[in-house]
Amino acid sequence: MAEYLVPKSAVVFEEEIKKSRFITYLQHTEGLEDARAFWAKIKQEHPNARHHCWAAVAGKPTDSLQLGFSDDGEPAGTAGKPMLSALQGSQLGEISAVVVRYYGGILLGTGGLVRAYGNGVQQALKLIESEIKVERTLFKLDCDYGQLRLVQQLCEKYQVEILSQGFQANIHLILGISEKTIEAFSSELTEKSSGRLVIQLLEIGE
């Protein structure tokens, strides 16, 4: 999957069910660490709430290693799982949901909880705007100052992201290139520079 949808902005949806107040927060989170930090932030904002339940599709929609959820004290399977199911049904990636519950004194039962938590996320999803995220591979490229304009023109043509620039004797660039344009960008860059400019895959740790 080279492209997928991610949330463009955060949303909040609130409803009251049998005197319990449910507040659903949705936000773009990139990776499980970011998702857990979002959960912690909402918990801090609502210290008096009874439960802060959480679910996340923190990577690509198809990446099962980037899924997470918590019932946070609710009966097992009544909160985090229905929240996660709603997120997965949206086909969005890099998204987290936190549902805060202020208990109103009336028990909802397991079925009622599943509906409350799952529906809160579903309703919030109707409010969210999304945008396309293009997966990019990182490459490094060294060029001199006279070649920079050519590189910039081709980056614009092929929608290549210039992620960093280091200006020393030469210019050291880190480029993010989508899978479908790597070959064409690399070929034209090499051709127009008479073979002097060649992108190299950025190794982990560089």
UniProtKB/Swiss-Prot annotation:
Transmembrane stretches, start-end: none
Classification via InterPro entries: EFG_III/V (IPR035647), Impact (IPR023582), Impact_N (IPR001498), Impact_N_sf (IPR036956), Impact_YigZ-like (IPR015796), Ribosomal_Su5_D2-typ_SF (IPR020568), UPF0029_Impact_C (IPR015269), UPF0029_Impact_CS (IPR020569)
Cited Pfam families: DUF1949 (PF09186), UPF0029 (PF01205)
Superkingdom in the source lineage: Bacteria
Annotated Gene Ontology cellular component terms: cytoplasm
Disulfide cysteine pairs (residue numbers): none
GO terms under biological process: regulation of translational initiation
GO molecular function: guanyl ribonucleotide binding; ribonucleoside triphosphate phosphatase activity
The family this protein is said to belong to: Belongs to the IMPACT family.
Protein name as annotated: IMPACT family member HI_0722
Organism: Haemophilus influenzae (strain ATCC 51907 / DSM 11121 / KW20 / Rd)
